[in-house]
């Protein structure tokens, strides 16, 4: 996908922002949970996002790689009220209905966003 960085003040969700939305589980798309997502672009009316977690996957990197999940550290941000370090999953892009975005949590730093974009493209 075309990855862009264009956060702008206002109510619209823009690439480069971390938002909260419902994310389906991979193993059963009928179930999921509310979590932070980094918006990386658009696909017509859909938003494209990468899920975030505060779980440290460096500890289970071998298992995650074996399962086909790739993670990248992005540090802390206002999307997490406890300011815990976060990781972004770089090999699962999620399509999100803009109406399903619950709130905008923060804008990700441009340099970190560019690093994430490069990792997604790799």
Residue ranges and their predicted role:
Residues 1-35, 39-122:
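Conserved functional hotspots at enzyme active or ligand-binding sites that engage polyanionic ligands
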